[in-house]
Amino acid sequence: MSCCASSAAIMVAEGGQASPASEELWLASRDLGGGLRQTELSVPNAYCGTCIATIEGALRAKPEVERARVNLSSRRVSIVWKEEVGGRRTNPCDFLHAIAERGYQTHLFSPGEEEGDDLLKQLILAVAVSGFAATNIMLLSVSVWSGADAATRDLFHWISALIAGPALIYAGRFFYKSAWNAIRHGRTNMDVPIALAVSLSYGMSLHETIGHGEHAWFDASVTLLFFLLIGRTLDHMMRGRARTAISGLARLSPRGATVVHPDGSREYRAVDEINPGDRLIVAAGERVPVDGRVLSGTSDLDRSVVNGESSPTVVTTGDTVQAGTLNLTGPLTLEATAAARDSFIAEIIGLMEAAEGGRARYRRIADRAARYYSPAVHLLALLTFVGWMLVEGDVRHAMLVAVAVLIITCPCALGLAVPVVQVVAAGRLFQGGVMVKDGSAMERLAEIDTVLLDKTGTLTIGKPRLVNAHEISPGRLATAAAIAVHSRHPIAVAIQNSAGAASPIAGDIREIPGAGIEVKTEDGVYRLGSRDFAVGGSGPDGRQSEAILSLDFRELACFRFEDQPRPASRESIEALGRLGIATGILSGDRAPVVAALASSLGISNWYAELSPREKVQVCAAAAEAGHKALVVGDGINDAPVLRAAHVSMAPATAADVGRQAADFVFMHEPLSAVPFAIETSRHAGQLIRQNFALAIGYNVIAVPIAILGYATPLVAAVAMSSSSLVVVFNALRLKRSLAAGRGATPGTLIHSGAVTS
Amino acid sequence: MNTLIYLIPVALSLGGLGLVAFLWALKSGQYEDLDGASWRILDDGDGEGESSQTL
């Protein structure tokens, strides 16, 4: 209970700062037909039954919500909602607010990101079928080993054959397909010895059964398949999923814009048909379609696409604007200076397509091992066969021993060695609030020696936050929120989030770009905005850090905002230092701001005023100097470097594109997620190497036994199972060390932000 | 030998029953939320009656 009782005021602000736009939520929801849509939100702070009841209750109270169900294992809530209620189009942001009001953080996760896929279902089915076959055949085999007489033994062998045959075809098809693919292209992989061992042992056993032989390997071939399928299924769960970062980015460029002809007539044209020199009108709330120059109008522009900074810049006649930036407050008339394909967003897309740095070149540990393993195994089996032919000259016996060698060396433990550790490590990371996209990312993270961090949104929270809410009376805050509803300015959004749900104020509303909002009501003229605008006098601070609410130029309240550093930043940087990792800052922001933050965090290596391209260059330079860098960033401007880096990480508050491009996403606020993820990955890497050592050690003992012909089916069954079990138990040690290591880094993560009241 | 004639089918069908039960559980989403299920058992629903609804 206590873990859920969190201070609503703080959490609302947190929930709000992460809230994606309504438009993004619509696009990310899945159409179920019949006017219903489904949205998946992640709720990293949900921990217990009360959380389930609270969140589901809050959502079900809304008329738009058809069904809501919290999944505590994946920390997600799935909401099925109606597109329209009473003729009003549903705003999915209301769900985020409803959850945030109860004190929970929410992040959007687009469907494709973690959806269970068909192949995984098929693999689980295959595991179930092979498990069924393995247990039943083992039952019969135990009877045979206990000394069933000849006729009974034959019967048991035949029944085993009947069970094993279909099971091998059904469950073994994954290995056969993959092995066939490899052979057809003249390569060999881990699946070739598997497919060979399984089918050869089945064939030999069938031959033995027909000839009333004593030894049959049906149990070995099916058990082998069972263990390997478990490894394959776990491995599949850790595979990287298709990244849609680039398509997400393309969504940021509008499809078209209104072009004004010299004669004054207007025409809506597709973005590709806009030529340099055309005059365009960009209304408030629209994205700039192509790079251009402002001809007339004043507005606040959200340039986070370009420099990652959330505070809008005021643009006026003569300023240049980049494609993809969002026009927040006033209409602008632009002159296009570049065609869409030469514009800023197109450049970022190009950079991202080009940037496939360490990721593409990296070969996974298991693949590297397989490259040496399978030829060695084949050679060994062949030599055994030849050797026994020379010694005895009995084809049948030589074949039996060779098959035994293949079965014994089959990479059972090896196939489990990596995926089990990675699944356990991913589970541990998830408990600490870090999501892993794929297993190779963890292997890469264990190798890094440098961390490059973005500033805004990564080292800092990145959004203005109301810091003096306790000084302001709730009534004033509600009034301000009612006015702020009319604006998209981040300050206005911050006020709305602090006040919770607000109904818009009635009256004559006007938004003055670069200044604030004015509402003429019966009580008088309310103004919310800069001090200069609201009360007609300049204040001590700049406009960004405060907003004034006034009635007829009398100050009613002063709201102060700050972009706070992310919690535990300093401790995390120190922890990275202790791990022997160098840190640096890559920022698009102005040099003095970056320098101040860098010195307060004790980081000497920093770069400021970097464009997305320059960020990639800094990262590439580090790679050329032999460093393996982890890049932590959140903005769209970071997306290319996130992709180019050896491995990358993004906070869940990051832009959709940034989240998609990163290998890891951390859901809680403190930056300690970064050292925590690195430590866990390194620990996992250690366990993987231990597991390899165990698997190789097993082979060193078992292979001579098999080559000498002492590996009966009983010996094979015992050896294979025990080696697999040892590997699995070794991997589970990682889970135990979670309990022990909780005091160190992840402790601060577990209940971050959930302030007990 | 005679007992085997019915014992083996019994053993196999019991195993098959387990397989079918597992597949059913998988398909009906019993493994979707292992952590949540243990908490939901304590939820008395407070008259909403919706808590048992599956998606």
Swiss-Prot record, chain B:
Task: Tell me the leader sequence span.
Answer: none
Q: What is its main location?
A: membrane
Pfam families this protein is in? Answer: FixS (PF03597)
**What is the name attached to this protein's record?**
Nitrogen fixation protein FixS
User: Where is the protein found, in the record's own terms?
Assistant: Cell membrane
**One biological process GO term for this chain?**
nitrogen fixation
- What are the annotated GO cellular component locations? plasma membrane
Disulfide bond keyword on record: no
Query: Which key words are in the record?
Result: Cell membrane, Membrane, Nitrogen fixation, Plasmid, Transmembrane, Transmembrane helix
**NCBIfam families the UniProt entry points to:** ccoS
* Keyword Cell membrane on entry: yes
Q: What does this protein do?
A: The four proteins FixG, FixH, FixI, and FixS may participate in a membrane-bound complex coupling the FixI cation pump with a redox process catalyzed by FixG.
Q: Which segments cross the bilayer?
A: 4-24
